[in-house]
Amino acid sequence: MKEKAESSVACNHHKVGFLGLLVTLGIVFGDIGTSPLYVMKAILHTGESISESTILGALSCIIWTLTLQTTIKYVCVALRADNNGEGGILALYALLRRLKYKWIYLLAIIGASTLLADGIITPAITVTTAIEGLESISPNLPVIPITLGIITIIFFVQRFGTESIGKSFGVFMLLWFLLLGVVGAFSITSYPLILKAFNPYYAAMLLAKSPEWFLILGAVFLCTTGAEALYSDLGHCGRKNIAISWGFVKTMLILNYLGQGAWVLNHADTALAANPFFAIMPQSMLFFAIIMATGAAIVASQALISGTFSILSEAMNLHFWPRMRIKHPTHVKGQLYIPMINLAMYIGVVLIILLFRDSSHMEAAYGLAITITMLMTTLLLGFYLHSKGVARIFTMLFMGAYCIIEAIFLTANLSKFLAGGWCTMLIGGILFLMMYVWVKAMKIRRHYISTKPLDDYYQIISDIKADESIPKYASNLVYVNHANKEGAVDDKLLYSIINKQPKRADHYWLINMEFVDTPDTLEYNCETLIPDTLYSVTMHIGFRIEPRVSLYLRQVVEDLVADGKVDLQSTYPSLRKYGIPGDFRFIIIHRVYYPESSDNRQQNLLMSIYALISKIGIDEPKALGLDTSMVVVERVPLIINHPVIKDKVIKVINDSETSQSRQ
């Protein structure tokens, strides 16, 4: 007998309309929308002399980078590579992990690690640059303390959720982009020839002739760092809303970049002393522009923090990261808060600000890690296109073209390594090591779980239930079954029921958890193995769904009771006459690794690191969403390749030898 619950609500795709487009502006484009704050300033500080050919070439590079990277790769191609409406590098990997290429997970964890590392510096550089605009009004203003204060507030409010203020993000970002476009267009009128930058000839000439081309490309790349976040936010807004909004956003961005370029050419002698973004603002609007820039930086930071929580939540369900405590501060679908990650990010951002002190130095650390993320996304997109039967020639051209483009950007950004890029690469390297060790250790743990055919034990389980000489352990006894074979059961689970302390119960429940490739699936199958005694419940959980076994099992039980397929009333007469249901108790089998159980040094080292990493997570009962007052954890050793004992450790002494020794 099998029963199946209805799937959870599918991904919430907003319909195309003004409201949907407005929400998209507030959620998706914060990162890429704040890039005009620092891109042109970074280009001017590469050391290249300011001339018309240099500025036209740099602007042409910006326009065509936005076109090739953001428009074609992400909006036209990547947004179509959705996993039931969800996007991002881990959602893309979830579509591909069943392929024959078992090493493909490396691309996903490299990309996720560098994306998370880059996220540490984004709030620092955007907020710092915005506050630095105040120096044009008050040169002695303490930028660092103000920046740290704003950053502290941003991270502090995460615990309360951002539902109330989040609704206004879209309106604010609409005003922000209009400000960018209008001010930029006004500045263009002072140097109309700046429009020649649309011609890619100027980009080609700059790259061919400038000795500082790699430094300029490293600065230009900052204009598209938010493209990966655009893909990750696909599930929040839908492809059409993002694509339509991008047309507006791109236009406003290009107008602003061109306006900054026009100002630079009109003020070539003094351009290095100012930030072109604030310089093109009319003096009467400067303070307003600084307030708007600070607000946009806050929106970008908020989107990035929320994105980090979502990425790590996905990583947990894909077994890339240890389970951590997740809170839901509001009723908004998908809004998460991970306290430990919030604290770690806050400390990281504060250290970045204190280490680099100003946005010019932060620019040197920015962009290197995200280039690697984009390269990994390109490779995964290539596998995706191939798996969907896209023409081989198109797939090869796509992968080849973008691997070359991103390899060039990576080479250019490597010039930033000693100047600050080492920081994000170090963070990314640590995160990659943690994910890699976690994946390998989980494989080892699964490999050494011994299983047995469950149907061989039906009779003994029935006999234990009927044997009233055994004290009743619980009315309903629930185990999480870690066997990954159909019809099999973890042998330590059987040992717990039968050998360790025979556990008599009215009903035995075996919970099998299967994390599926789709994001929002939440289904179950329930099979009665022994009528009115043993049940097997398989929960199919999407990679964006948080496991909450107690809640899900309650629904399963209620469904079965409603259908008259199980009687959960207490068997004790004094309780049954009042309609009181039987109690539930959960048994968790926790395997403890002992280095002595293996003579493989490499494996011992890996499992030792795994043990350290697991300390940042929560224990299995909390990870599964169980009521800890109803849980018993039984610890058993994880035996791995125990070395064969060739010689007896303890010698048997016969009676004659004993008597002789006593004499």
Question: Where in this protein do the model-derived segments appear?
Answer:
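The structured alpha-helical core of multi-pass membrane proteins
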Residues: 2-663
